[in-house]
């Protein structure tokens, strides 16, 4: 295996939408950084089975909905 071609693999803290925190190893960020999730398995409708509204941090969901609002029109 070649040296110095792989990204740094270090420990980060992940904070889920309900405030639950856990430590994991990742190439994201720097050692000790905190990754705050916008959506996870506890809040995503695909896993919760409901039609719950998604949290819109940063306007991503609203931009997506505006862009694709007429894509699947129900007659």
Swiss-Prot record:
Summarizing the function annotation, the protein's role is: Binds the 23S rRNA.
Against Gene3D superfamilies, the record matches this protein to: Ribosomal protein L31
Q: Which SUPFAM superfamilies match?
A: L28p-like
Q: Output this protein's name.
A: Large ribosomal subunit protein bL31
GO biological process terms held by the UniProt record: translation
Origin superkingdom: Bacteria
Which family does the similarity line name? Belongs to the bacterial ribosomal protein bL31 family. Type A subfamily.
Assembly and partners are described as: Part of the 50S ribosomal subunit.
Question: Which InterPro entries does the UniProt entry name for this protein?
Answer: Ribosomal_bL28/bL31-like_sf (IPR034704), Ribosomal_bL31 (IPR002150), Ribosomal_bL31_A (IPR027491), Ribosomal_bL31_sf (IPR042105)
User: Which GO molecular function annotations are given, in alphabetical order?
Assistant: rRNA binding; structural constituent of ribosome
Cellular component GO terms held in the UniProt record: ribonucleoprotein complex; ribosome
Keywords tagged on the record: Ribonucleoprotein, Ribosomal protein, RNA-binding, rRNA-binding
Q: Does the keyword RNA-binding apply?
A: yes
Q: Can the keyword Phosphoprotein be found in this entry's annotation?
A: no
